[in-house]
């Protein structure tokens, strides 16, 4: 900074404004670096709290493949409780889900700030946008088939019962569920930032906020239990 120009500054506000005007790039870079550092810190903190294993979840899902869907949910639920008795809810509560143009129903099995686990699916055909999140998402197919595609790819990728798809962090896809498609969906990462995906569809598209309120109740209850009782973020 020019020394003689500095002498003309009479107070701190003038000095601060002059500093900002002369160093916008430095300040912008500093803010960006701070945001990235905070995100990395949160990510590391959350990943240390991961309890659910994708290999175990896949094996649990296979217990229900080929069974009538009610029996499949029961069998998978029991397997999950056997492996994670302290983290899986004992009761299944179903509610409507709208997000990214798709509609189905879901049942919350586990929810914390770093992980979620749900049953999800639809007896009808449904398609939409996956959303783009700060988390990884796994869909373990129980029944039916889901299809997905990515930008620049012109053939769909099919995932029948017994298989699973993986959506990396900050990647989006188009997808569809064929009629009577059901899955066990697992996400790990910064879970709270995914809530607007569900919220905005409930408020601005369907005008039905009841499912969202129900989801907030079930998810909030599990998150609170994990934080206060199990000391899990």
From Swiss-Prot:
Extracellular side: 45-93
Designated name of the protein: Protein erg2 homolog
Record family assignment: Belongs to the ERG2 family.
Endoplasmic reticulum found in the keyword field: yes
Residue ranges, Cytoplasmic side: 1-23, 115-233
Gene (name only): erg2
GO MF annotation, one: C-8 sterol isomerase activity
Biological source species: Dictyostelium discoideum (Social amoeba)
A Pfam family per the record: ERG2_Sigma1R
InterPro entries xrefs: ERG2_sigma1_rcpt-like
Predominant cellular place of this UniProt entry's protein: endoplasmic reticulum
Membrane spanning stretches: 24-44, 94-114
Domain of life per record: Eukaryota
Keywords, alphabetical: Cell membrane, Endoplasmic reticulum, Lipid transport, Membrane, Transmembrane, Transmembrane helix, Transport
Compartments where located: Endoplasmic reticulum membrane; Cell membrane
Entry GO terms, CC: endoplasmic reticulum; endoplasmic reticulum membrane; plasma membrane
Function: May function in lipid transport from the endoplasmic reticulum and be involved in a wide array of cellular functions probably through regulation of the biogenesis of lipid microdomains at the plasma membrane. May regulate calcium efflux at the endoplasmic reticulum.
Gene Ontology biological process terms in this record: ergosterol biosynthetic process; lipid transport
